[in-house]
Amino acid sequence: MMHICYLTGLYSRKDPLIFDRQGKALAMAGYKVTIVVCDLEPNETIDGIEFISCNYKPCSRIERMLNTKKFLYRKALMINADVYQISDPELLSLGVKLKHKGYKVVFNLREFYPGIIHDKAYLPKMARNVIAVLMEKYLKSSLKKYNAVFTVTDDTDNRLEKWGIKNHY
């Protein structure tokens, strides 16, 4: 049985996309599904989906961006799934690291992150353009290393095509 593992430090256990739409559909189709989350809740199985906690919950956005990767990476190596899926932009490097270890890794590009940086009130206005440009370059270089990228809009799909990323769906 193929084992698919979702890694997230951003989304909750019952995120509508990860748990309800993707996870349940895969479990019902006969796949083993694990969702690894950064929270302090006990491990459990719901609707055939195994939830594993990192036993770590970041207290701030900065802490989440800096620390969740190491906790999720340790759990990912222990789980040894066939495919890992990541949806968090701050985990792009984690996916690349898993890919270098020989794992299959996919990224779910839910939003075009460089485009939404301009709306982030917590970022200084003067820095948003620079951060957006850097994020776009980082996203482009990272996603080329993934086995597949899932998109939700034609605009994002077209952008990935222009970047030369062929494995997007």
Label the predicted regions.
Residues 1-19:
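Nucleotide-activated donor-dependent transferases that construct or modify glycoconjugates
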Residues 15-29:
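Short amphipathic alpha-helix
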Residues 49-74, 122-128:
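A short, charged, and often flexible helix/loop element on the N-terminal side
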Residues 56, 106-137:
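Acceptor-binding helix/loop patch of EC 2.4 sugar-transfer enzymes
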Residues 70-77, 97-101, 113-114, 128-149:
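Membrane-proximal helix-turn-helix segments that form the acceptor-binding/catalytic region
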Residues 74-92, 103-106:
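Short N-terminal targeting/anchoring amphipathic segment
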Residues 150-151, 156-169:
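Helix-loop-beta element that forms the nucleotide-linked donor phosphate-binding surface
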